[in-house]
Structure formats: C-alpha cells, structure tokens
C-alpha cells in the first residue's frame, strides 16, 4: 500500500490542473497520485478535438499556478464578443478595449493542452501517475481513505478527489446524488473556415432551435458549437460538407462572409448534471464530476477551474491533514453560491433563447437592445463572461 496526501481520480483538465496547482502552491510538499484510465501516449477523451474558451478569470487562475506560460503559445485571444438573435436586429457587443483588458478570454484546443499537461505531470517530482488504471473500490476510515485500483494496487491518502468526468465512477461508488435535466438538444461541433478573417472575434447567435457559437482559433479557423433538437442534429450530421455549410450559413448569417470549409464533425447530447453535494468524508468533487453545463455562454469548464482553485487553496491551508472536515466544509461553502448562480444563469439562457414563442422573443430582443445601450445592465453578463465572480 503506497501512501499519498491526495489521490486524484481523473487526469484530464480538472484533475491535471489540481495536481499541478498543489505542486506549485506547496513547493512539492504534498505527495499526489493521479489515477487515469487512458495511457499518456494515447488519445484521451478529456483532451479530444474540441476547443474551449478560457475566461479572463480562468487565465488569471492559471497564471497564479504558473501554468499559463506553457499554455499561452497555443491560445488564441478573444478580443470581441458579438451576441445576436437570428432574424432580429437586437444585438450586443463586448470588447476587450472597452473593458480595459488585453483579451476577454482565450481559445485553446484540448488536444494541445493535453500534451502540455501530460509533459508537466511527468516532470513533476511530487506527482505520481497511475495510467492506465482506474479506481475499482474506495474504503474510507476516520483519518484516511484507501483507493483500490483495477490493476491490483492500493493507494492510501488523506483525501480522494473525483475529477473523473460527468459520469463519475467515484461519485457513484460513494452514493453522491446526481440531479439531471435533459435540455433535449444535441451539440454539433466542428472546425470551420470562413471567408473573412475572424480578427479575434467570437460570436454567439441565438436561433429558435438553439445557440450557434463560433470561437476564434489559429490559422483563421473557427470552432463551431451548434445546438439543435436531436432530430435536426441527426439530419445535420448526415449532410455532405457542402450542404452542412449551406445550412450553417442560413443559421449564422454573413458576418464572416461565406462559410468555406468544415472539418470532422462530432455530436453529443446536452444534459445538465450536477452533484447535490460536492464533498463527503475524505472526499471532494471538482470539474465535470461536480457539474456538467450546457455550452451556452461557455461557462462549464471555467466553473470547474474555479472549483479546482478553491479546493487547492483550502488544501494548502491545512497541510497537516489535507482531508480534514473543516477544510472540506470551507471548500463547500466557498463554491455554493458560484455553482448555484452559474447553473441558474446558463439554464435560464437556454430556456430564454432556444425557442420562438412570441413573448419570449420580444423579451430577449428587448433585453439585448437594453444591454447594448445601458452599461449597467451589461455588467452582470460581463462579469460572468470574464469569470470575475466570487469563489
């Protein structure tokens, strides 16, 4: 039985960030184990072909943990965000220049970050990687937790952290209740090339079926997230590239000129999942294991990184017992408001903008017009977009 201070189940974005943050904040004082089912040299589903938008606040957290310098070279800045409603004049714009920041956020490809994180994890002397391996069974005692792996090894620690994704094996084993809501939408994702250079602009276009988001990437590509009812998404996935681009052009419009090229497409169902509790005895939950959100407004990953930052900070306040109940309670209390507010905001936006009822259509267009003309109304959206929220 090998002794550790912290065992982290899951080595994708949330788990890897937590391990590296603990290493930096404690100057390698804590022994950390990362248990990951996928081998380092294989394609990791947590580091797949998708892109994500890192908010200004998330980048600030990564800077604090000394991770941003490694990620920055492969990140594309978002200098402007344009929000509009299809077939209506209402719109609002947010620009980095108006806010007084270098960028509102940055877009990174998960595959790039995966390679960077794997290299950093392997080089860190206080982190041990168990891969390929998975948590098979968990036993909890008064002052420790035993983590039995499917390769026959057993790890003992003061704290187990679940960062093992939306369908968390650790959470299921320990009976952590999961609340779910099916949005009855499917996200179609792909990279596209447009006629006009994006110039750092991101777009969120609301339609009667769901939002269409385009994020700026390197080489003048755009990362597409197109939310549709499942039957329409199935139809769109079967279209030829030419037909797909034509349909996308109809939904998005001509703000970037002609849609010229589309890469490989993928799709996944959109379901809100969140754990009613994010702690238990000698156990904490972060990232997608704690909550998985609708991609509208790009809040999910950034919320998960705020989980990671708060937990890392609380762990380092009590190094003599990193899994103490007092530390976990402080983590829970810190995260409660942000989790509830972000889940409520994203869910409300989905219901407000993903339909064509006349009353809601009028209300959302009026809201966009007012936000574009009254800066006070734009501030809550702006702070959430930037990730500048209390944690």
Question: In which residue ranges do the predicted regions lie?
Answer:
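Beta1/beta-strand and adjacent pyrophosphate-binding region of the FAD-binding site
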Residues: 1-12, 33
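N-terminal Rossmann-fold NAD(P) dinucleotide-binding loop
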Residues: 15
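Glycine-rich FAD pyrophosphate-binding loop
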Residues: 23-48
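N-terminal FAD cofactor-binding segment of flavoenzymes
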Residues: 46-86
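Conserved FAD-binding catalytic core of PHBH/FMO-like flavoproteins
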Residues: 62, 160-258, 262-265
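Conserved N-terminal helical subregion
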Residues: 74-173, 181-186
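FAD/FMN-dependent oxidoreductases across multiple families
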Residues: 234, 238-325
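C-terminal helical "tail/cap" subdomain of flavin- and related membrane-associated enzymes
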Residues: 313-391
